[in-house]
C-alpha cells in the first residue's frame, strides 16, 4: 500500500529507517505545514518502517507527487532520489511549480527449466529438472512432494546490454513467491536473504551483458516431511509425531496424515525489473 501520512512535527527533516536491513534514507519528498509534516510512504505486505525526524531545515525540496488516483504511487526512497514502482504519468510538486515525469518499468521473465538440487539424505533425488516453477508438493516424485529442508535452484541466462543513454538504470531480481526463506547468488556474488514480500534484490552491480548464472537456495518448514512420514506408512521414518494442532481450528488435535501440505520452494514468476530512478536533488 502507498499512503500520504501526516506527522505532528515542525522544522525537522524526516528519515525512513528499515528495521530489517538497518538502512537509513532521508525523505526527499515531503511538505512542511504550519504544524505537520506530510509525506508519501509505501509499505509491502507485513512490512514495518520507522519514520524518524532529525534536527534540520528543509531546503527547497519537492513537496509531493500527484498521480491519476487518490493515493501516491508505490515508491522507494533513495539518497536524493526516488524509485517509482508503477508505470504512468506523475507530477512532482514544489510550491507553485510542478515537474511532469513519465515512468516506465521494463520486465523480463526468466522462464524455462531450472536445475533443482535436493539433499538425498532426506528422501529426495539429488537433482531434478523442473520444466517450470511449481511447488514441491505438486511433484509426482514422493521424495520431492514431502521434502523438508533446503533445495538449490540453478539457472543460466543471457542478458542483453542495457540501452545506451541510460547510465542510471537500476535492475532488480524479483522472485515472485517462495516458501519460506531464500538466499540469492548471481555470478557467484551473494545478494542476501529474502524472507518477506517483496522477495526482491538489486542486481545492477553484478548483472553482466551475456552469460549469467543465478542460484537461489530455498528452505521450507518441517511440516511436509512429518505429513509424508505419517502418510507413507514406512517402517523407518525420519520423524514420528502422531498429531498436531492446526491454526484456526481451536485446540483440537489432528493426525499429521490429515494435515494439508504447505506449498514449498521457489514459486515465481522470477523476473528482472529495470527502472530509472527519479532525481530529486543535485
Residue ranges and their predicted role:
Residues 1-150, 158-166, 203, 271-282:
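Carbohydrate-binding surfaces of carbohydrate-active enzymes
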Residues 6, 157-159, 163-187, 194-195, ...:
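Aromatic-lined ligand-binding clefts that engage carbohydrates, nucleic acids, or primary amines
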Residues 48, 169-171, 209-234:
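Short, well-structured beta-strand segments enriched in hydrophobic/aromatic residues
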Amino acid at each position: 500500500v502507498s499512503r500520504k501520512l501526516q506527522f505532528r512535527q515542525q522544522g525537522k527533516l524526516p528519515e525512513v529507517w528499515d528495521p530489517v536491513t538497518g538502512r537509513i534514507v532521508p525523505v526527499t519528498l515531503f511538505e512542511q505545514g504550519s504544524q505537520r509534516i506530510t509525506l508519501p510512504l509505501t509499505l509491502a505486505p507485513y512490512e514495518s518502517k520507522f519514520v524518524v525526524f532529525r534536527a534540520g531545515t528543509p531546503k527547497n525540496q519537492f513537496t509531493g507527487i500527484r498521480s491519476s488516483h487518490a493515493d501516491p504511487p508505490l515508491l522507494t526512497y533513495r539518497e536524493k532520489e526516488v524509485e517509482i514502482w508503477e508505470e504512468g504519468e506523475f507530477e512532482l510538486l514544489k510550491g507553485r511549480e510542478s515537474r511532469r515525469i513519465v515512468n516506465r518499468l521494463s520486465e523480463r521473465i526468466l522462464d524455462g527449466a531450472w536445475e533443482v538440487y535436493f539433499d538425498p539424505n532426506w528422501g529426495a533425488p539429488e537433482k531434478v529438472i523442473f520444466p517450470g516453477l511449481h511447488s514441491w508438493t505438486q511433484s509426482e516424485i514422493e521424495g520431492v512432494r514431502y521434502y523438508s529442508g533446503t533445495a538449490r535452484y540453478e539457472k543460466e541466462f543471457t542478458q542483453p546490454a542495457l540501452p545506451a543513454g541510460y547510465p542510471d538504470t537500476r535492475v532488480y531480481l524479483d522472485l515472485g513467491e517462495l516458501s519460506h526463506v531464500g538466499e540469492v547468488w548471481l555470478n557467484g556474488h551473494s545478494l542476501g536473504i529474502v524472507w518477506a514480500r517483496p522477495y526482491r534484490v538489486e542486481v545492477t552491480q553484478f548483472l553482466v551483458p551475456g552469460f549469467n548464472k543465478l542460484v537461489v537456495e530455498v528452505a521450507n518448514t518441517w511440516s511436509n516431511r512429518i505429513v509424508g512420514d505419517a502418510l507413507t506408512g514406512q517402517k523407518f521414518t525420519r520423524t514420528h509425531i502422531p498429531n498436531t494442532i492446526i491454526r484456526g481450528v481451536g485446540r483440537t488435535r489432528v493426525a499429521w496424515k490429515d494435515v494439508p501440505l504447505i506449498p514449498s520452494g521457489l514459486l515465481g514468476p522470477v523476473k528482472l525489473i529495470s527502472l530509472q530512478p527519479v532525481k530529486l536533488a543535485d
